[in-house]
Regions:
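As written
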Residues: 77-78, 180-182
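Hydrophobic faces of well-ordered beta-strands that scaffold small-molecule active sites
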Residues: 1-6, 29-31, 56-60, 81-83, ...
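C-terminal helical cap(s) of enzyme catalytic domains, especially alpha/beta-barrels
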Residues: 95, 178-179, 190-199
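Conserved anion-binding
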Residues: 65-153, 157-158
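Alpha-helix-loop-beta-strand connector modules within alpha/beta enzyme cores
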Residues: 37-61, 94-111, 144-171, 199
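Short, small-residue-enriched loops and turns at beta-alpha junctions
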Residues: 8-13, 33-38, 62-65, 87-90, ...
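Non-catalytic positions within long, well-ordered alpha-helices that form the structural scaffold/packing
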Residues: 22, 74, 126, 178-179
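Conserved N-terminal beta1-alpha1 strand-loop-helix module at the mouth
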Residues: 1-67, 124-128, 199
Length: 199
């Protein structure tokens, strides 16, 4: 599954990029964190009005008040929202509970986790009822030439839920992520900043 991340500050630019991506066949559209911080949940409402059949992801990166944030995202029209794992399991559990109550999928962002801890946490998230987990390669790691392939390969045998991968993916690296076991490939700038996003 291709997920197009709209990491813009202006809703008008995000909608323009979403239109092009939709024309190109992308059906999973993400209101990125910068867009949500700039425009709020109006970004989700606007995307839902324009793309009623899209699978909309609100990249809320929730850290606290999980039930409240997921309820708000669901009521705005999101199909899925994201939660970042912290030292407290309660936030993820509240998001999962809200997901059941409001019909919104939960993606747990595993940013920063590695090795055995990554596997342990991903398995726990699956047991709690998360829809999928996301391996997010930070920009700083990308600048050092790192990629998420090894993490995907290490994690895939241990969970049955989808694994999403994000961070610097393009037409050359996305197939490698899929080959490694990623189910959802999240691409932002390589699509939204291209001359022909529909292609």
């Amino acid at each position: 599954t291709l997920q197009v991340a709209l990491d813009f500050l202006e809703l008008s630019r995000a909608l323009g990029a979403a239109r092009e991506a939709w024309k190109g066949g992308a059906t999973w559209i993400e209101a990125g964190t910068p867009l949500l911080k700039s425009e709020g949940l109006e970004a989700i409402r606007a995307l839902r009005r324009e793309f009623p059949k899209a699978y909309l992801i609100a990249d809320t990166k929730t850290l606290d008040a999980g039930r409240t944030e997921f309820e708000a995202a669901a009521k705005a029209g999101a199909n899925c929202a994201t939660v970042c794992l912290t030292d407290s399991d309660s936030t993820v559990l509240e998001c999962v509970e809200a997901g059941k109550n409001y019909g919104i999928d939960v993606c747990v962002d595993l940013l920063g986790l590695k090795g055995d801890r990554l596997i342990e946490v991903a398995r726990q998230c699956e047991a709690w009822g998360a829809h999928h987990v996301s391996l997010h390669l930070p920009i700083d790691d990308q600048m050092r030439g790192l990629d998420a392939t090894a993490q995907i390969q290490a994690l895939r045998p241990h969970v049955t839920i989808p694994i999403a991968v994000a961070g610097g993916l393009n037409s050359e690296t996305a197939p490698l992520a899929v080959k490694a076991g990623a189910t959802i490939v999240i691409v932002g700038g390589a699509i939204t900043k291209s001359a022909d996003a529909a292609a």
